[in-house]
Amino acid sequence: EQTYKDWTYDTALKNVRQAAAIDPLPVYTQLEGDILFAQQDYAGALAAYEKVNASNLASAASFFSAAKTKELLKADAKEVIALMDSCVAHCPQPVTADFAPYLLERAQLYMNNDQARNAMLDYDAYYKAVNGQVNDLFYYYREQAALKARQYQRALDDIVKAIELSP
């Protein structure tokens, strides 16, 4: 396989901007955001993702990209959670296994922001989305959410299941 020796993020950015100048499709803006993100230009990436999210190309993935970028920019947690809410809202309902990782990501965000009950709901939705095909770590994380939410019996049940799967 032949690789391009002179290919860089800057070259890719220049090319995608030229393409957007010819035909300003949202897919080019998404790609520009991804390149800027890879270059760690998070402010530029966020601006691109926000344009995509205001277009007909808005998707769970584009809102997720915006949420992760805002998180890296140390934005207020409420803003990041709002973007993750939009991410999950753009998933097919009921959420399928392909989109289930977004639920785990939001559950972790909820846990980091003392919203254990909301985290439990996302863990439960994840469990449903993957038809119960989960591992010991899942049960441990859901147990932690249940414990913080003062759902002690659920917490006990989940930690027992985690230990069963990984003694």
What are these model-predicted stretches?
Residues 9, 42, 76-77, 116, ...:
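TPR-repeat structural position
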Residues 25-28, 61, 97, 101, ...:
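Start-of-helix register in tetratricopeptide repeats
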Residues 5, 38, 72-73, 112, ...:
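Register position in tetratricopeptide repeats
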Residues 23-24, 57, 92, 97, ...:
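Short coil turns that delineate tetratricopeptide repeat
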